[in-house]
Structure formats: structure tokens, C-alpha cells
UniProtKB/Swiss-Prot annotation:
Protein name: Putative double-stranded DNA mimic protein HI_1450
Coiled-coil parts of chain: none
Pfam families: DUF440
InterPro entries the UniProt entry points to: dsDNA_mimic_put, Put_dsDNA_mimic_sf
Signal sequence residues: none
Organism per entry: Haemophilus influenzae (strain ATCC 51907 / DSM 11121 / KW20 / Rd)
Cystine bridges: none
The family this protein is said to belong to: Belongs to the putative dsDNA mimic protein family.
Assembly and interaction partners: Monomer in solution. Interacts with the DNA-binding protein HU.
Function: May act as a double-stranded DNA (dsDNA) mimic. Probably regulates the activity of the DNA-binding protein HU.
Comment on protein domains: Contains many negatively charged residues, which are arranged in winding patterns on the surface similar to the charge distribution seen in dsDNA. The secondary structure elements are arranged in an alpha-alpha-beta-beta-beta-beta order with the two alpha helices packed against the same side of an anti-parallel four-stranded beta sheet.
Length: 107
């Protein structure tokens, strides 16, 4: 018997990702990127809930079911409202009782 997973709503996933980003960015981003993000976030910043990619296995070395995770990007958007400078991509489990996450940081 399989149990239905209650998926994160986009706003909750965005809040979780942004909180993690703020907590961990200082340890994982170059100081220049942190400065850029802080200076431009108010004008160009974005935190976007996106369709969960199926290539996370290549990034994290673990096969995942895209239906069990939400994907959120944190970065800066350009004049066309496209996120062209991604500082972090988050993969967040929909399982509330066992909330795990993976992050790909800008290199």
C-alpha cells in the first residue's frame, strides 16, 4: 500500500528554500557573489518554483523521483524577467516528516 504524498505548495517551497539560502549562502558562495546578490536582490532578485528537473542524479549522485520533490531557484532576473544568474538550485522533499533537501550552489 502506497501513501499519497501531500506536495508542498509553491509558496511553502519558496519559503523553505530562501530560508536555507540565507542560512548557508555565506559558506557556499564566493564573497563577490554574496555582495552582488545583496546589492541587486531588491531590484532584480527572484526565488522561483520551477518544474522539477529529471537530471538531479547527475548533480547529486542519487536517483530521485521528480514527483517526490519540489525544485526552487534563487538568483537574479534580467530585463526579460528570466533568471539568468542562478545562485542556488534547491531540491526539497515533499515529505514533511522526513524533509530532506539538496542544493547546487553557483560555482
Amino acid at each position: 500500500m502506497t501513501t499519497e504524498i501531500k506536495k508542498l505548495d509553491p509558496d511553502t517551497a519558496i519559503d523553505i528554500a530562501y530560508d536555507i539560502f540565507l542560512e548557508m549562502a555565506g559558506e557556499n558562495l564566493d564573497p563577490a557573489d554574496i555582495l552582488l546578490f545583496n546589492l541587486q536582490f531588491e531590484e532584480r532578485g527572484g526565488v522561483e518554483f520551477v518544474e522539477t528537473a529529471d537530471d538531479w542524479e547527475e548533480e547529486i549522485g542519487v536517483l530521485i523521483d521528480p514527483e517526490e520533490y519540489a525544485e526552487v531557484w534563487v538568483g537574479l532576473v534580467n530585463e526579460q524577467d528570466e533568471m539568468d544568474d542562478v545562485f542556488a538550485k534547491f531540491l526539497i522533499s515533499h515529505r514533511e516528516e522526513d524533509r530532506e533537501f539538496h542544493v547546487i550552489w553557483k560555482k
